[in-house]
Amino acid sequence: MHDKIKMDSSWEGRVFPLALIVSFGFMFFYVSLGFLGVIPSLEPGAVIGEASRWCERVSTSMFREPVNALSNLGFMITGLLMFWVLSKDVRSADSNQFHGLTPISMLYAGAAIYLGPGSMLMHGTHTDWGQWADNLSMVMY
């Protein structure tokens, strides 16, 4: 018979809302800076309307590669779904590390979420720091 551990500590109930707030906060911050004209930039050699190194034409909008940038919302949604499912999961005392909110499951879900903003910064800005954020997110995953 498996012993069940009900997750009812106060911090476990806050993990999903915190991940949701951080994700929406990033999007709000990015879009706000985009409307203010702070974020969009161009890498040297890139020409508006020409295909970039990642097969999408470079745009003048706040997202230099709109499809590549916005498709990264899928990673954010997937990571948020992971946090939601994990926060509702009943953990067995002898279960593996991906049942419930364990350090490894939270790290994995957090890395999945960060893949979205990291890649979005690269495809959205075409800057060196955006490329750095993208590389960091892939290494973290």
Feature locations, PLM:
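Early transmembrane hairpin module of multi-pass membrane proteins
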Residues: 2-141
